[in-house]
Amino acid sequence: MPNDTDVRILDAVCSFEPVSFRAPLKFGGRIVDKTFLMNVEVTVETHSGNHATGFGSMPVGNIWAWPTSELTGDKTELAMKDFAERIVNIASQVPHYGHPMELMFDLTEEYAHTAKTIVAGHNFDGEFPKLAQLVAASPLDAAVHDAYGRVHDINSYDALSSDFMNDDLSDYLDDQFAGEYLDQYTLRTPKERMPLYHLVGALDPLTDADVVDRPNDRLPVTLGEWINADGLTHLKIKLSGDNFD
């Protein structure tokens, strides 16, 4: 059932911001030293004519969202950027009002066709992975939720209850979730402290003996230096998978 708090998308714009890494990262057998941020701005309008603009951003992430030995990283990166632009353009043409959950859920119907069009246009072998589609669309999703929260002057996570959502989770999942809403699965107040996970790539130097080139920026380089500097307690370790000794 429609809600007075529903919004429609007035405008959606996608841009790409190049980012160079301080040090190369080895992930999934590939070495990357740069990427792009997919930045999306979305302006929404309420039934009463109020406007707000939200923002969402996500690294392209093709190195993990589209693991393949058939295509180069440059090609999968280009395809994901293409997908992001197309989906954002489609979103800007959606005429109806709704809650961000249903607006974005309806948009997912365009994902498969858009992905097939891109694969054919770039003359790729194989399919455009669903994970890569979701990652490429994620900054749009974040921007729509952000704009919705801003136009109602609330935390967007607090807009996931029956007071704002038009449908319960059974519409998106199955009957087991009848009568349930996303606010039941999210916190109402932010945690004061959360552990920071430090990513350790397969090329990251563990000791001074592993350092090939030390940047002249006074920041830590070895894992031990990072632990001492930031008081790390949680590590996310990426293995190269080619050394079992």
Where are these regions (language model features)?
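Short, Gly/Pro- and small/polar-rich lid/capping loops
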Residues: M1-T43
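Metal- or metallocofactor-binding catalytic centers and their adjacent structured scaffolds
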Residues: A52-D158, S162-D163
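N-terminal amphipathic alpha-helix/helix-capping segment at the start of soluble metabolic enzymes
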Residues: P2-V13, S162-D163, D171-M194
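Conserved, mostly hydrophobic/aromatic
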Residues: V40, G49, L140-A142, D153, ...
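Metal-dependent enolase-superfamily TIM-barrel catalytic cores that perform enediolate-based chemistry
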Residues: D175-D245
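A generic structural motif
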Residues: T46, N62, G241-N243
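Glycine- and acidic
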Residues: L25, D125-P129, H234-L239
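N-terminal glycine-rich anion-binding loops that anchor highly charged ligand groups
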Residues: L37-V60
